Amino acid sequence: MSTSASVVFSAFTSSADPRLQGWLSFRGHLQADDVATIRTPRPPRRGDSRGETATDGAWSSRSGIWRLLASNSRELGRSSSVYATFGLARAHVIELQAGVDRMIATTVTGPTSGTHGWVVTVDDVAVMTSGRWYGTTSTTRDACAGALAAFRSALVTQDPRQMVEPGARRPRRTSGDTELAGSW
């Protein structure tokens, strides 16, 4: 078992996947605050590794996200973008790790009283969000600081995880990691 945080990649096989829809809904609540309304995300430049936002329709049905996990597999943070390919997602994580000092954290108020989350931006573009709601602003700030510290030195996995239905068993791997990465 690893003693350090890791960045894992999760691939979705359909844009209608309920886990993707849940992720989009949560992200929408996080970015509905001032972060999303005051700052206009820049359009990606040619060759840019930043993922597309899922609301712009530019991503494919086979898409994925990344998640920052603690050594005990607890989610510390997640990508703010949906990525069309595994290669783009992994390249963006490596690019972000090199620029952690440029990251700006903002706490946001959730959809109901007593819920708080956080969003991290680089150059006014949201790149990472909390993975859950917190009960207090101070807990939110502490969680964000911990996520940023972990992200700086997190191990970046070499392959994506294919999402499976809740309660279903993961099939034995019949294809290699390269083939799985290519399918996303």
Question: Could you tell me what each predicted segment is?
Answer:
Residues 91-92, 102-110, 117:
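Intrinsic, low-complexity N-terminal interaction/targeting segments
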Residues 1-43, 69-97:
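Negatively charged, low-complexity tracts enriched in Asp/Glu with abundant Ser/Thr
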Residues 33, 57, 79, 131, ...:
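Alpha-helical membrane-protein topology signature
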Residues 2-6, 10, 150-184:
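Short, charged, intrinsically disordered terminal tails
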